[in-house]
Amino acid sequence: MSTDFASSIPRLRRLLPRFRKMHIGVLGDLMLDRYLWGTASRLSPEAAVPVVDFVSQSDCLGGAGNVAANLAALGAHVELFGVVGGTKSTEKQGGQKVRADEAGSALRACLRKEKIGTRGVLADAHRVTTVKTRVIARHQQIVRIDHERRDALAPETEEKLFRLLLPSLKQLDALVLSDYEKGVITDGFAERVLHACHQGNVPVFVKPKTSRLYAYRGARAIVCNTKEAGFFVTRALTDEKSVEDAGRALLPHFGCAAVVITRGEKGMSIFEEVSPRHLHIPATSFEVTYARVGQAGIARGATGRQVFDVTGAGDTVLSVLALAVAAGASLADAAFLANTAAGVVVGKLGTASVSPNELAAALGEIQE
């Protein structure tokens, strides 16, 4: 079932200023997205691969950090909880202190730049900071190099992280779990966090991974793509009926109030425990332009066809959905807003976020 959201747009535009009052926590796997920019004009004599002449390097937040960056860009107060790699250093008093490794320090610098709280970010000398290094030349990604560990956190590190999170729940309007299977979120840890949030009346929004089907019981909403949803129900989602059947099956499996299945160029489908029918929102993509100096504008692209770079689009959906519901929107309105935000970020290269001005302009374009 598709719905006309024309009547929702004025409500959502009035909702945007409320984002600045929201306090959102993000718990999950922290990553540094590193870009090596260069030029390529020749092939290597050693192999049939291009030689890239290095020009510059840039770092930005990935994983749970990208979720936090999306929330911060929309004006929310964000506190991030996760783990970076560390190294031990000897103090003058003779003791040892764990400091973030090079990538962890770069990640923390990115967090400070985005004004994201880092009190919940631990450095662990037994781990490395996850880094996704992309080599870009001629506007194309040549190769990606991953540096990471996927095993679970040590029990003492997990306990420290939980003890950092627990007192913060009193100030949070929502908590987002961003699970990339890099070791921070385990079944047991997720269950402890969900239980604590339930006791504190904090709604939880989850982007799950395929190895954890039953760890998120009690979440307000689960966000997954068609591939992940198909894995959960052990069959490919190839048409509307298979998507609807999967959504209905996942509600009791996850034990959550709602399931949101993102479908790329086909938009998203929303399933709620309280509704016998599902809601479908068609995709819309935008290309960010600047109509006037200093004034962000949105040029509407082709609906359901013009997709540029989907890196981090799922993080955008998760972020906006959680923030909008925390600010008072219905799940349907929040999903429509999240779908609109995703349509903006796919027009940007790499992991990206959307500003309130861009989102308001995109809503205006849809209304026209």
List where the protein language model places each region.
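Conserved post-catalytic alpha-helical subdomain immediately downstream of the catalytic base
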Residues: 253-257, 287-366
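Conserved phosphate/ATP/ADP-binding segment of small-molecule kinases
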Residues: 182-300
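Gly-rich Lys/Arg/Thr-decorated short loops/hinges at beta-loop-alpha junctions or inter-strand turns
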Residues: 44-52, 138-151, 224-232
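A structural signal for isolated positions on well-ordered beta-strands in alpha/beta enzyme cores
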Residues: 25, 79-82, 120, 174-176, ...
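Active-site metal-binding loops of divalent metal-dependent hydrolases
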Residues: 30, 180, 316
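Conserved phosphate-binding/catalytic loop of the ribokinase/pfkB sugar-kinase fold
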Residues: 83, 113, 121-127, 134-169
